[in-house]
Amino acid sequence: MKMRVAILGAGNIARSMAAAVRGLQERGEDVEPYAVGARELSRAEAFAKEQGFAKAYGSYEELVSDPDVDLVYVATPHSMHYEHAKLALEHGKNVLCEKAFTMNAEQARDLTAFAEEKGLLLTEAIWPRYMPSRQMILDLIDSGVIGKVTSLSANLGYPITHVERMTNPDLCGGALLDLGVYPINFACMAFPEKIKEVSSACVKWETEVDAQNSITLTFEDGRMAVLYSSMMVQSDRLGVINGDRGYIEVQNINNPEEIRIFDLSRACIRTIPVPEQINGYEYEVLACKEALEKGWKECPQMPHAETIRIMELMDSLRKSWGIIYPMEK
């Protein structure tokens, strides 16, 4: 089947998705860069012309009303994800929703239940979940090359306090939902067991959102993950998985570039490149295409239950830090 993709929103992340969809079409995949919707028609038209999309709409309602749209990618700030994803679902559209999936777990539960009721595909666009590097890392853990795995660490930080969505509580700002979600997902992909204990700390920005945070997860099997995210500094973005015979380094947990294996003497014994990609977003699109072709209502790479589990964890972290968004009061 040809899958006609529509993008709801015309910001930077929408451009990244547009490039991926266009790249898929150029390499012969049955995917069409079909339509874009923005709050202003002129902006949508400029985006469509620049990115090679066939149609432009000056409202989100018009976009989701187009009967030829097969998949809507929600690319607005995460404070608006619930509203915009639900709008698309109400109009019978399958949805790929950018992370963080929603503002909180309550919204996530409502949205996934609504999609299931409507019989539509809904999945969270947390891109490392869909990348081939995910299975490569899991296969290495299972192979025993680093022995018995006991712990991991992961971090992600960028100096982006100048970006309004990061510091504005009305936009669900803070490092956790925008950046911290990646180390958390890295840990939960590597260690799928139930989390037994959580400890954490955060430093707040002047607007009372979290500027940087440190999270330690202890899993029921005794493994541990130590995680850090920040919107104040550039970090090395490194993921390290530790075993009793060595360790695995993942260069850039946000978009893995290379995987290295080290022995107990800290000597690199193997370097594994990740497959070439358009920009990494294409794997989400292909997963949605496969799901639609097979009649699935969620993607196995990020099932609804896992999205809700991550949102519940982030809710509990914010609660422990005393961070409540204005819309939640």
Short names for language-model regions:
Residues 1-51:
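N-terminal Rossmann-like dinucleotide-binding module
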Residues 31-35, 70-72, 174, 247:
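Short active-site oxyanion
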Residues 39-40, 274-286, 302:
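Active-site loop of classical SDR/Rossmann-like NAD(P)-dependent oxidoreductases
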Residues 53-60:
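Conserved SAM-binding strand-loop segment of SAM-dependent methyltransferases
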Residues 71-78, 82-126:
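Beta-strand-loop-alpha-helix segment that lines the small-molecule cofactor/substrate pocket
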Residues 71-73, 220, 287-329:
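C-terminal helix-rich "cap/oligomerization" subdomain common to oxidoreductases
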Residues 128-199, 206:
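Predominantly a Rossmann-like dinucleotide-binding segment in NAD(P)-dependent oxidoreductases
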Residues 185-258, 275, 287-294, 328:
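Contiguous beta-strand/loop segments that form the cofactor/metal-binding neighborhood of enzyme cores
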